[in-house]
Design a protein with these regions (language model features):
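Sec-dependent N-terminal signal peptides
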Residues: 4-14
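Residue-level detector of conserved, function-critical positions
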Residues: 21-358
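Sec/Tat signal peptide C-region and signal peptidase I cleavage site
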Residues: 16-20
Length: 358
């Protein structure tokens, strides 16, 4: 196996989100009162609630807490690694390089030994070590495969800029800043231009299709068609690429969102209320919230109530109304983790079903 590796420091073990890895969502932590167990997707209890805390399963093992100490159980609920640690991380795979097969020139490895490991410490401020799947201490920490550090593997974006300096200034405009076609392959070309510090749009016949009265105009491709995001006097709206109105310029906030399910939405705010519209102008999230943000790690929108409480709208169409003190979205969009006003955490699935009981 030929893999480049990224060396792991002990410090990185406890950052949690540095390296992406999928959890096993077939068993979900389930809380009854103050104790945690595990339930299947239909909320049937599989592992009896008995722990002070319980995390998701990774590679067949899950972190649990009892009597103030952390350890690990398997999917049958059996304690595999004793509950004796002050802090731990979930298990993941790493590699021990074979030093005989290391290229001196660039450090590439021909052969590696794949190992399952986690970070652990016997005291909160103590020395952090790596342990194996049976709880044994490793002499050193494994390396992390470079392809698991997703933020390091995003290809650089190539931005092609058009030089408009050859287009002479005229009485119609001062400068062209961008161009576009309504749809790929269309004959008509449109130009975003400025005049007297205001933005407008002209076509290739030098006809004004959007007057020069906006403080900002930007193009946005949604569903294969070009739209124009416009701002005037602090208000935001959207036009079709040909200048026809789409969403009136009367919103204090307007944010286009291309969701992971392929659908496109607009977060719109007016008169202090925020909602979400689909491409047919229908409100899929009613305009009653103080703020809404799209969560990039999932398929949904975080809702903020007037009292700063948090809720969530799943792409499935289900709404969890704002009433929680905190909210964390789990990658994949199937679950959120919420903190109640009483300070207790719990999981909710994309059908808005609670995996906890008070």
């Amino acid at each position: 196996m030929k893999n480049k590796i990224l060396l792991l420091s002990i410090v990185l073990l406890f950052t949690g989100s540095v390296f992406a890895q999928k959890a096993d969502m077939s068993l979900i932590p389930y809380r009854i009162g103050d104790v945690w167990g595990y339930a299947s997707a239909d909320r049937s209890i599989v592992i009896k609630p008995q722990f002070e805390d319980a995390e998701l399963f990774y590679e067949g093992l899950a972190v649990v807490k009892k009597a103030g100490k952390y350890g690990y159980i398997n999917t049958a609920g059996k304690i595999i690694i004793p509950l004796k640690y002050a802090k731990v991380t979930h298990f993941r795979f790493g590699y021990f390089p074979d030093s005989k097969n290391t290229k001196p020139a660039d450090g590439d490895l021909h052969d590696e030994k794949k190992v399952l490991f986690a970070g652990a410490s016997l005291t909160v401020d103590g020395y952090e070590i790596c342990i194996g799947a049976k709880g044994q201490r490793m002499p050193k920490c494994p390396a992390i495969p470079e392809n698991s550090a997703t933020d390091l593997n995003i290809p650089e974006k190539v931005v092609v800029k058009t030089n408009y300096s050859t287009i002479q200034k005229s009485d119609l405009f001062d400068k062209i800043t961008d161009d576009y076609k309504m749809v790929p392959g269309a004959e008509q070309t449109y130009y975003i231009a400025t005049r007297a510090n205001n933005y407008g749009v002209i076509n290739n016949k030098f006809e004004v299709v959007l007057p020069f009265e906006y403080s900002m105009i930007k193009k946005k491709n949604l569903g294969g068609m070009t739209y124009l995001l416009a701002e005037k006097n602090g208000m935001h709206g959207v036009f079709f690429g040909n200048g026809s109105p789409y969403i009136s310029v009367e919103n204090t906030k307007l944010q286009p969102v291309s969701a992971k399910n392929g659908a496109n939405y607009f977060i719109v705010a007016k008169d202090g209320k925020t909602g979400v519209k689909d491409m047919t102008h229908k409100y899929v999230v009613e305009s009653i919230y103080s703020d809404i943000t799209y969560d990039q790690t999932s398929n949904g929108f975080i809702l903020t109530g007037a009292d700063s409480t948090k809720g969530f709208w799943f792409i499935t169409g289900k709404t969890v109304e704002p009433k929680y003190a905190e909210l964390t979205v789990l990658p994949g969009g199937e679950f959120i983790k919420v903190k109640t006003q009483a300070g207790k955490w719990g999981y909710i699935n994309s059908q808005a079903l609670d995996f906890f009981e008070e």
